[in-house]
Structure formats: structure tokens, C-alpha cells
Amino acid sequence: MFTKHSVEIDWGGRPLKLETGKIARQADGAVVATYGETVVLATVVAAKSPREGVDFLPLTVDYQEKAYAAGRIPGGYFKREGRPTEKETLVSRLIDRPIRPLFVDAWRNETQVIVTTLSHDMENDPDILAMVAASAALTLSGVPFKGPIGAARVGFANDEYILNPTLDEMTDTQLDLVVAGTSDAVLMVESEAKELNEDIMLGAVMFGHRHFQPVINAIIELAEKAAKEPRDVAIIDNSAIEKEMLGIAEQDLRKAYAIPVKQERYAAVAAVKEKVMAYFFPEGQEPKYEKLRVADVFKELEAKIVRWNILDTGRRIDGRDVKTVRNIVCEVGVLPRAHGSALFTRGETQALVVTTLGTGEDEQYIDALSGTYKETFLLHYNFPPYSVGETGRLGGTKRREIGHGKLAWRAIHPVLPPHHEFPYTTRVVSEVTESNGSSSMATVCGSSLALMDAGVPLKRPTAGIAMGLILEGSRYAVLSDILGDEDHLGDMDFKVAGTESGITSLQMDIKIEGITEEIMRVALGQAREGRIHILGEMSKALTAARAELGEYAPRIETFKIPTDKIREVIGTGGKVIREIVEKTGAKVNIEDDGTVKVASSDGEAMKAAIKWIKSIASDPEIGQIYDGTVVKVMEFGAFVNFFGTRDGLVHISQLADKRVQKTTDVVKEGDKVKVKLLGFDDRGKTRLSMKAVDQTTGEDLEAKQKAEGGAEAPREAAGE
């Protein structure tokens, strides 16, 4: 019934198995990949005919994790998987980015790649396996895919690279780098690092590239057994259209792309396009070519002119040379009620970034396959349509926004203080208010400033820069701080973030079939120069975290109580802790080890809550003086609440230093008094005294009398 084919290799000390022919046989390509005991299924289906009216590759990639893969049942009312999680979205992008540039340019058929995690062994993250499985499924499917690709994760610890570190090993590594590419070149890099230098980062990329070659060979071996016949793709010759178009549009396009202001340049390019379309499609005449073909050629001509200008003259669209960074303006404290805020402007790219500090109640609970965990640092990136002068629909967070937000998160995360030193939940929101290239790196710079403005003690300020590439044969130019047009019309988007000490995040996407180690080395070196320059500009606004938290930020005090007192502080059904929160207005969080965190933006509220909790969790000391409130008056004395919820008796003989006939002659309910703890009787009842304390000053009269008596004795002895 089944015609199965499989290959198996040892990879990084664990078996990797690729199998096809048993599951999902109606898909164009289907591969079950197993690494350790982590299993994923990758499927590829492509439409039989091209999609009409599109000038792009209609590729969709969806990665999904099933709760059953980890032996769990989903939470929530419906008990089934819902919309994609952040992890699923990020892995979908991770698969998409290296495979997209490898499709034949003319391919316009709807193509869908779906990767499903079927089993997770809690050791091997499914993301790398998902990339490998998708590559194998595409290679078998018959779609015009110029792969296969391989992928690997690289860690770095004890001055050594680690291939595909396990989840446990990842907790101790200085690097989390994912690299993908072909047998010849690197196509994609995604990473987070603890301020590593350029040589270590480049070494990690090349280490990963070398070590996924056996995976590529295994996919080729499987394809030789089971691949379908390649589909035919109609390659259309547009050279005649391009020749005509050059004659009527080249000079106008060169002039348009010499205009430095984005909106003016776009208007000029649109005018040239209108002229070209009018030439090729005159009114009342039968056109020689399809409109879509002419529009495609115009787009290609735009790219060629920009690229020729840069390679021939070394000058870019806005007049800069290849290394110059646009003008930068940094401002902090721009929003009066925010805990921390910054406005970062670089040329025509601008980000308004806001930091908010919260407590343990604000931590995000993330339900992952490996288990539920809490996240205390959140970074959200928003890209509204007005940032590029367009209208658009506002709705749910888009994949791009999630991806850019995570990139900035990775850049900032390594320089945050440990949670035990700074016990806040921190949320950073970046509102991209203008965009002309590199808005994610503007988010990194703005986030660093906003965090320092809020008083978050970062290890060092962090900045980011986006690099581009123009590659024609053996000629190339690496561009610092790319514009949006240079991103769209160039061959590479290479983003580097870090501090003066090293790189914290590196992301690379290649639109051609890979770049060489030499080009990456040049790009990393040039990026460091740009990053140091940007950090210098940022230092004009703020050089380090403010000494104090923002005026409206909550303050958090942390202390410990005995674990056997936790129940008393919480109370039956949470009654006591609710009362503390309601009456003081402070937030209280108690952990299982007795750690108590009290948070409030009101200092008095915090003091009151701390005092209340400590009074419950500790015992009063004999001989100490306490403030108290008379809660009940009896014939034999008064009961006084003096230590949290603890009451004690002031016997009638201890009310005053004279004979008292009636308790009410001295006190009544509600009176504020000062009492001294005398001790406890045989039944454990608390004995208090008012007469031992000066009710005005709170001075201990018994101690005063003893001191005076002790001071007189030597004088008497001397007199004798």
C-alpha cells in the first residue's frame, strides 16, 4: 500500500531521519522528519496553473504546533489550538525567508508549505527540523525550487561552537544563532548574542554552514529516490520591452532617483511610469504586450538604474556615499506621564518608543510545547499605514510586526539587568511614525533610550543598523543605513544590533542565491563603524540609565518572610492579603520561597503594606515600644491592637503611674496610644503597659529611670 523511501544520518550526535511515501501522499511533496524524538510533517502543494494578475511569488508558509506533540491538552474553553502563537509565526517566517529566493523568478503558481510538529522530546527544538523538512518536501514536490537548503542552530560556550544545542544546553550558551543556506552560500541568519565580537559571529555562521552540508546531501539522496518530475515554467523574454523602455525612460528614472526626499522621489518615479505606460498602451491602439509584463520590466529597470548608479559612482539615492549614516536626532522624556519615552529619528525613519514598568501581576504567561513559563520583558512593534504616507486597515498584529518586534527584543534582551536585581515586568512599545528603511533598528535605538529614560539599568546602551548589498558579478557595494528603496531594489537586508562591546543580535536575509564569507566580513566591519557612530549620537540625549525611576513608575520593595508565615499573610481564602491590598492600595506578590514583592507608586502606601506584612510575619519583641489603638475597654483594663493584627491587654494597673478607678477615666475605644511589651503570661496572652511610656514623646520611662539611677550611684560612691 505504501511506497516508502527514507534516509538517515547521524547529525550532531543524534539521528536525523527523513521519510516520504507513507503520510500525506496527496500533497505534491510530503516529508516526515525525525530528530531524536522530535517529529515534524512538512507538506507542499502548488496550484496547477499560475495565479492571474500577480507580479510576485504567491507563497504561503505556515508552521503549527500541536499540543498532543508534548502530551498536553490545550487550555481555554474549547480545548483546541487557536490562532497562531508568536512562536508559530516566528518559525513560519524562519522557514519562509531562506526558501523564497530559491524559486524560479517566473513562478506565479499559488504555493503552500505547511509544517506540523507531531512530537516534541523536550530536547530538540522543532524549528530547525521544520526548516529541514520543508526544504526536503519542496525538493521532492516538483515545483521549480533551486534548493535544497540546510539549516542549523549554533550555540557558543567555553570558547567553543555547539551544533544544535539542546534546550537545556541553550540556558548556558552565549549565542543562539540559526543559519540556513545552500551548499554554496548562506541565505539567512537569525540570532541573539551576549555582546560577542564580529569574528565569533561570523565564525558561528560559517560553522553552521559547514555542519548542515550532510543534511543537504541527505535531501538530495532522498530526492534521487522519490522526487517528482520538475514542472515546466514558461520563461518569457522581455528583452525587447526593456530595450524600448530604456530609450524613453532611462534618463528620467536616473533624475528621479537623484531626488533625496522620499515622497518627491516617489511622485517623480510615478510620473515616469505613467509616461512609459502611455507609450506602450496608446489610446485606441491594440497593445503589443500585456500590462503586467511592462510593469514587471519597469520595476526591473528601476532596480538596475539604482544599482548601476551605486556601483558606477559610489553615490546613493539620497546623495550619501556607501558608509554614511543619515542625520540622527534623539530625544528622551517626550511623554509627560509615561514611565520612560524616547523619539528616535534617523533621516525619514522615526520611532516613538515608550517604556512601562509593571509588577509580577503583569508578567506574560506563555503556553509553549515545552511547558508554561513567564516572560518579564515584552517588546511590541507597531507599523501603522501613515508611517509610509498610505491608508490602510488597522487590525490584528501582522507577521512582519511580530518578526520585527522579536528582532528588537533579541537586541535588547542581553543587556537587561537580571530579574532578581530589577524585579519589574517591563513592556516596551515602538510606534513607527515614519518609515524609510530600517524601522526595526530605529526601534532598537529608541528602546534603549526609552528604557534608560525609565531608569532601567541596562548594562550598556544598544544601537542597531541595517546594511544592504548591491552585487553584480564580481562587483559589489555594501551600504550602511539603507533606505526603503535600497532594501527593495538591493540584494541583502543585513541587520546588526549591539553595544560598544559587541553584537547582541544579527539578522540577515538574502534575495539572491547567497553571499560569500568575504562580503559578510565586510558588512560586519562596516556595520560596527555605523553602530559606534549611532551610539555616539544617542549619547547626546542620554548616556546611561537615570538614577531614579520615572515619577509615575511603581516602586518595588523585595524582602523575605518565613515560609511558615506565608499562610498567615495570605489568610483564609486570601482574606488578609486582599485586605492589605484594598486598604493600602499597594500590589503584593508572595512567592513560595517567602519572597515578598510590594509595589506602589505611592511611597506611603508601600510603607504601610510592608509594615502590615512584617507585623504578621514576625513576632513582637519584649521591651520594645509600639504604636497602638484601643480596640476594647473592660473593667480590668484595655485591649490594644499594637502589632499588625495582634492585640494585647493593658491591665488597669498599667494604664497610668497613679491609681486608676475606672479604665474609661484614662482611655476609650479608638484612642491612639503608645505601649511597651512587658511579656506573655502563662497562657500566652500578651501583657502591655502604657505607664511605662511617655504618651507624648514615646520615651521609655522605665529605661530612663534605670539610667538615671545608674548614673547617680557613682556620684554617691565618690561622695563617700
Curated annotation (Swiss-Prot):
Binding site for Mg(2+): 487, 493
UniProt superkingdom: Bacteria
A Pfam family per the record: RNase_PH_C
Protein name: Polyribonucleotide nucleotidyltransferase
Tagged with keyword RNA-binding: yes
Origin species: Bradyrhizobium sp. (strain BTAi1 / ATCC BAA-1182)
Annotated region (Disordered), positions in chain: 692-720
Function noted in UniProt: Involved in mRNA degradation. Catalyzes the phosphorolysis of single-stranded polyribonucleotides processively in the 3'- to 5'-direction.
NCBIfam families assigned to the protein according to its UniProt record, in alphabetical order: polynuc_phos, PRK11824.1
Alphabetically ordered keywords of this record: Cytoplasm, Magnesium, Metal-binding, Nucleotidyltransferase, RNA-binding, Transferase
Boundaries of every S1 motif domain copy: 623-691
UniProt family annotation: Belongs to the polyribonucleotide nucleotidyltransferase family.
Subcellular location field: Cytoplasm
Major location (coarse): cytoplasm
Catalytic activity: RNA(n+1) + phosphate = RNA(n) + a ribonucleoside 5'-diphosphate
Enzyme nomenclature, EC number: 2.7.7.8
Gene: pnp
Stretches assigned to the KH domain: 554-613
GO MF entry, a single one: 3'-5'-RNA exonuclease activity
Cofactor requirements of the protein: Mg(2+)
A GO biological-process term: RNA processing
Keyword Metal-binding (UniProt): yes
Biased composition range(s): Basic and acidic residues: 701-720
